[in-house]
Regions:
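Internal gly/pro-rich beta-alpha loop/helix module
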Residues: 129-239, 243
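A short helix->loop->beta-strand "cap" motif at the edges of active sites that frequently abuts
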Residues: 117, 175, 360-364
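Acyltransferase
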Residues: 199-239, 281-282, 291-295, 462-492
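Intrinsic disorder/low-complexity segments
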Residues: 1, 234-282
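Cysteine-nucleophile active-site neighborhood
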Residues: 338-419
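Phosphate-binding active sites in nucleotide-utilizing proteins
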Residues: 283-349, 353-360
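ATP-dependent carboxylate-amine ligase catalytic core
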Residues: 2-115, 119, 123-150, 157-163
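C-terminal and late-domain segments of enzyme folds
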Residues: 112, 283, 295-314, 325, ...
Length: 492
């Protein structure tokens, strides 16, 4: 059974080539003209999806082939695109970069292959002419089954440069040029850590989103891209040579475009969207979710899986709320940037006291990365200032100038825990600029219940700090990596 929604993948030859700007611009341009654009981001990154969510007006989902599975990704894609007109997937790093130096595992190419999606490859054209065709040909032929349908040249030059690149690609009988962005035409998006700064911090205005969309419409044949994305669902990958049409006004064509997409979707039988899982909890479990400027790194499908399993998610702000919501059964602190708001978090003594009381009550608390830092005794910022925090865990953290850890991680539970019995395995991602500056006291009652096997960096380590029904770790878990994990968590 094939999913009918037209789809496309925006990939790059490497990081920093303009994938996010192009993806956001295309998503915004299509959405503001009435198309329901469902966006996705390849890999574990929490940051770029915030921009894609703002651009499309719909929640962006991560597609990670290492943390989850092909079957899960196909089902998630089907569910998310059930009412969409088109799906846009932003890749990560270079198209073939992922969790392995030898295979497609965890790469953008793997997702394109699984979704049977045409790839539009972004290439840096600065200082390149016919050599760009060699690059594209290499990417097109490197792995079987990957369909590079079009090329978008970034940092291009004159009209003559455009013509030269187009002729070079045509002569090489490879994917056609569907756009060239002149150097400096895209607004610069500031960066922080891995990817972009958060949308909440940037308060990315509509004017900037529209500027990105305007640049894409001016220099990229958006209609050709949509046509190719739609045609793939019927033709099974036969790509016509694109012309060099320029978009001057999409408003008069958008109704026809939506009609074409609707007709194409009707030709293919779509799988039924995933039905909610029957809950084993007749009365809703009330799970408090820390959600504010300091805590916002959550995989949307993780939260949805909790809801399908019977949880009522109740948001609260550790920055501005003075008390936890009433009648909670558990707390979930995700990651984010607590170091940026450490003073405000420390000044909110009423909330810190309430979190400590909650921990003393024996109810469940789960914390990841920034949440781990918040539950600790103190956080020392880059300026040397130390901020007292919840003190639920007898740990202290310190911010570093350089990246401390960046890696996929497989977790084996060495003891029964909130996420499963001893011996269960889950997968996740670790990314942080802080480190623990003390060890757990031997007589504290805390255990390290994770045996962590990392893909990169230090290979193995013990982590996952647990005491009673409190569990905290630097690792962001993807719950789909262990299907029984959510039910086990809610039952505890």
């Amino acid at each position: 059974m094939k999913n009918a929604c037209p789809r496309l993948v925006i990939a790059g030859t490497n990081s920093g080539v303009g994938k996010t700007s192009l993806a956001v611009g295309l998503a915004r341009g299509l959405a503001r003209r009435g198309l329901r654009v469902q966006t996705f981001k390849v890999g574990p990154d929490f940051l770029d999806p915030t921009y894609l969510t703002l651009a499309s007006g719909r929640t962006c989902y991560n597609l990670d082939g290492w943390m989850t599975s092909r079957g899960y990704i196909e089902q998630l894609f089907a569910r998310a695109t059930a009412d969409a007109d088109i799906a846009l997937v932003e890749g990560a790093m270079g198209m073939f970069d992922g969790a392995s130096p030898q295979t497609l595992e965890g790469s953008t190419a793997e997702i394109a292959l699984w979704l049977d999606a045409p790839v539009f490859l972004i290439v840096d054209a600065h200082g390149a002419a016919r050599s760009l065709a060699a690059t594209v040909q290499g990417f097109s032929q490197f792995e079987a089954g990957i369909n590079v349908a079009g090329v978008i040249a970034n940092r291009g030059g004159s009209e003559r440069h455009h013509a030269w690149l187009s002729e070079s690609l045509s002569a090489a009988a490879t994917a056609p040029l569907v756009g060239m962005l002149p150097g400096g035409s895209l607004p610069t998006l500031p960066s922080r850590h891995l990817g972009l700064i958060t949308a909440d911090e940037a308060i990315l205005p509509t004017a900037v989103l529209d500027q990105l969309a305007d640049v894409c419409e001016r220099h990229v044949d958006v209609l050709k891209i949509v046509e190719l994305a739609s045609r793939q669902r019927v033709a099974g990958g036969q790509w016509p040579v694109a012309g060099e049409s320029q978009i001057s006004d999409l408003k008069s064509e958008i109704s026809d475009l939506k009609s074409q997409i609707s007709n194409l979707k009707s030709q293919i039988t779509s799988p039924q969207p995933l039905a909610p899982s029957p809950s084993s909890n007749p009365s809703k479990i009330r799970l408090g979710i820390a959600r504010d400027a300091a805590f916002h790194f959550y995989y949307p499908d993780n939260l949805e899986s909790l809801e399908r399993a019977g949880a009522k998610l109740v948001p609260f702000s550790p920055i501005s709320d003075t008390r936890l919501p009433a009648d909670l059964d558990g707390l979930y602190f995700g990651g984010g940037y607590p170091e940026m708001y450490a003073a405000r978090l420390a000044d909110n003594v009423a909330m810190l006291d309430d979190v400590r009381r909650f921990a003393d009550s024996g109810r469940a608390i789960y914390a990841e990365c920034g949440g781990l830092m918040y539950l600790g005794r103190s956080l020392t910022a880059l300026d040397g200032a130390s901020h007292s925090l919840a003190g639920v865990l007898p740990i202290e953290t310190t911010m570093l100038e350089k990246l401390r850890s960046l890696s996929y991680a497989e977790v084996e539970l060495t003891e029964n825990s909130l996420w499963g019995p001893r011996g269960a395995t889950l997968r996740g991602h670790e990314f942080h600029y802080s480190e623990l500056t003390n060890h757990l006291p031997i007589d504290s009652g805390w255990q390290e219940v994770y045996n962590v096997r990392r893909r990169f960096g230090d290979r193995n380590k013990s982590e996952g700090f647990q005491k009673g029904r409190i569990l905290a770790s630097y690792i962001h878990l993807h719950f789909a990596s262990h299907p029984e994990a959510v039910e086990h968590f809610l039952s505890h």
